[in-house]
Amino acid sequence: MSGAIGPIIGQNYGAGHFDRVRRAYIDGLIYVLVYVLVVWTILFFIRDMLVDAFSATGEGAELVRLFCAVIAGSFVFVGTLFVSNAAFNTLGYPFISTVFNWGRATLGTVPFVWFGSLWLGVPGVLWGQAAGSILFGAAAAIVGYRLVTHLHRRPPGEPPVPIWRIALSPFSTGKSLTGI
């Protein structure tokens, strides 16, 4: 999904169809929601079959059941993050994409998993991972929605103001690094 939504957003942005950019972003989020709900529903109903298929017992069986019944739903927010990052990258905001990706992978994972494990043991690891994904996915969706609803203020052709400049080595234009 994240590889497919970027070109659609980019083409409509380049053509100045800001309403279509917003619609593509929202449709991408809806697609992620529906897809995860379908898979989550399937996992919910086959969770005991999966436990049997993996010959899981005890705590392992309970973890599989927890994931299939509850935690799998948090992947809506992982997908939301992917769609939002594709939009950020396509619209010229790769730094925002990087912040959200790095944030979820570090700040949205390590402390949540650590505290989750302290409070709930092994299931807390899954709960912590889900909590971090929900936090960063929801934040990315909010920022992404605000971005696509305010595109008309910055027409195509005007690149966003860079947050920093990459130091260029001698004999280099830096185009391979920045794409500019």
Identify the residue ranges that each predicted region occupies.
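C-terminal transmembrane helix end/exit motif
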Residues: 115, 130-180
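Hydrophobic alpha-helical interface/terminus motif in multipass membrane transporters
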Residues: 9, 50-51, 88, 115-116, ...
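Short membrane-interface helical motifs at transmembrane helix boundaries
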Residues: 38-61, 65
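Transmembrane-helix signature of multi-pass solute transporters
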Residues: 29, 34-42, 107-112, 135-142
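Membrane-interface helix-loop junctions in multi-pass transport and translocation proteins
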Residues: 62, 105-138, 148
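Residue-level recognition of transmembrane alpha-helices
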Residues: 32, 68-71, 75, 101-102, ...
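Small-residue-rich hydrophobic transmembrane alpha-helices
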Residues: 1-41, 45, 78-100
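Alpha-helical transmembrane segments of multi-pass membrane proteins
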Residues: 58-84
